[in-house]
A protein has these predicted regions:
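Mid-chain, structured segments of secreted extracytoplasmic proteins
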Residues: 79-107, 118
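Sec-exported extracytoplasmic/periplasmic mature domains
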Residues: 99-107, 125, 185-194
Length: 201
């Protein structure tokens, strides 16, 4: 009886794998992004560099009013939809990406007079056969005691070889798109004007 039970389990597992692959190929999968986590690269930027970054608070992040609400809700990769696990919003995913980096570095302080807010300006990904492309842009604003000290739009992009098979191309494109959030936060931390605005006092 045991060998038959094992064989049956293997068959079920095989069918489950085939169905998962088929769903990607057929274009009917919902693909949630992974929750934001601190990165070694951004942690190094927060702890090093000059001037040193002081404690900050992360305020509201919203979608640009000129954009359709759908831009904040999902991106399509060969008819599969990538969605944010943070309130179903890419603007909130960007906020959380920044927040967890600051928290991990011990720089998040709700009482700080330096507040970072953001506006999601662009969010896109394309994964045709050939070259895949993704882009993410946002405007970041730093206020200190109510006075604007920094206001700048930043953008990051990615391109990669996109294969024919959806079972490979779709997760690859989703990973490239998700990585842009960490890269955009990294670009913010590299900006000398931003560092000056949130410098330790």
């Amino acid at each position: 009886m045991t060998p038959r039970s094992t064989d049956s389990g293997m068959v079920r597992a095989l069918w489950a794998a085939l169905l998962a692959a088929a769903s990607l190929l057929a274009g009917c999968a919902e693909m949630p992004m992974t929750p934001p986590k601190p990165t070694i690269e951004n942690a190094a930027k927060l702890r090093a560099g000059s001037p040193a970054i002081g404690p900050v608070e992360v305020g509201k992040f919203t979608l640009d009013a000129a954009q359709s609400a759908s831009v904040d809700k999902g991106v399509s990769i060969r008819s599969n939809t990538v969605r944010s696990p943070v309130e179903g919003s890419f603007a909130q995913y960007l906020r959380e990406t920044l927040r967890v980096e600051l928290q991990s570095a011990g720089l998040l302080d709700a009482r700080s007079d330096a507040v970072i807010t953001g506006t999601l300006l662009d969010s896109s990904v394309e994964a045709p056969v050939g070259t895949g492309k993704a882009a993410l842009a946002a405007r970041f604003v730093v206020t200190r005691s109510g006075t604007v000290r920094y206001d700048r739009a930043l953008r990051t992009e990615a391109s990669w070889d996109s294969p024919f098979m959806g079972v490979s191309a779709i997760p690859q494109a989703a990973g490239q798109y998700e990585a842009l959030y960490r890269k955009l936060v990294g670009a913010l931390l590299d900006d000398a004007a931003f560092r000056a605005a949130v410098a330790r006092q």
